Amino acid sequence: MGNTVTCCVSPDSSPKEGRDREVTESGEPYQAQGEPQDGDVQHMSVWELPIDLSNERNPSDDAQTSTIFLCKSQTDVREKRKSNHINHISPGQLTKKYSSCSTIFLDDSTVSQPNLRSTIKCVTLAIYYHIKNRDSDRSLDIFDEKLHPITREEVAHDYCKHDPDHKHIYRFVRTLFSAAQLTAECAIVTLVYLERLLTYAEIDICPSNWKQIVLGAILLSSKVWDDQAVWNVDYCQIMKDITVEDMNEMERHFLELLQFNINVTASVYAKYYFDLRSLADDNNLHFLLEPLSNERAQKLEAISRLCEDKYKDLSKAAMRRSISADNLVGIRRSNAIIS
């Protein structure tokens, strides 16, 4: 009952009697892992979890796990700080503004409405650290740029040996977002899908596949996140050298590798947003801060009310969809008797 695990065994039979005589390949007696000793009954929490539940530690699924890009960037951040300390170099501008009781400094980026330009810079910097500090060059043919080129330009024979810099990645992503008119939230979801793909498929993003992987993540996130989704043929008009068939095939493989898990919870989204802010702070990509004025305060209040009304409408719509014919979910009010 409850949290206690028990089993019923016949008094004249012992489940251990035959099992203890089993011998493994190494010649040692077999003993089940986690077997209780001295007749004690173990709790379910100490049992080994099945493999299917291992993805709970995936940062793109679990809000408690640190993002992969932030962990990969820490090596460069520590080396940069150590080098600056040894060479007595200032880490950057010492004119960072801090809020006080009389003045509050804010930027125009919030978790509900991030700044597009700053968010793309942070996301592409995260992709840059993924490529630079990758563990190996594991990849799949569907994402190989030479096997499936997205431009008619001839791919260099040593294309897999040169890591792209941050500016190159930023120009590639910014071109897609500007042409497709995508939002900053879509950029954050793109990074979530990218890290989920690397974890699920057990591959690395490297010079030979980064364009295909980033394009597939943007394509999928734009369809999931934006209300007015961009069609594959629209991306073919942006990148005129790729066919619709190739785009459809890449999207299909991307979804299969994600195991069709395109869900992004609010907590995971918020974690990626704030980790991107931390990444920007570690690399001196400071957001433009301005003093809080009455006009900006009213604008922030209007944005908050708009988001609050939006979430209320979504919750009401979900409630209406969940009401059955018997009105089991509906709120019932008793009739008042006025005497």
UniProtKB/Swiss-Prot annotation:
InterPro entries: Cyclin-like_dom, Cyclin-like_sf, Cyclin_N, Cyclin_Y. Residues 14-24 have a biased composition (Basic and acidic residues). GO terms for cellular component: plasma membrane. Residues 1-42 are annotated as: Disordered. Residues 141-263 form the Cyclin N-terminal domain. Residues 1-13 have a biased composition (Polar residues). It holds the Pfam family Cyclin_N. GO terms for biological process: regulation of canonical Wnt signaling pathway. One of its GO terms (molecular function) is protein kinase binding. Gene3D superfamilies: Cyclin-like (1.10.472.10). SMART domains: CYCLIN. Keywords: Cyclin. Belongs to the cyclin family. Cyclin Y subfamily. PANTHER family: CYCLIN Y, ISOFORM A. This is Cyclin-Y-like protein 1-A. It comes from Xenopus laevis.
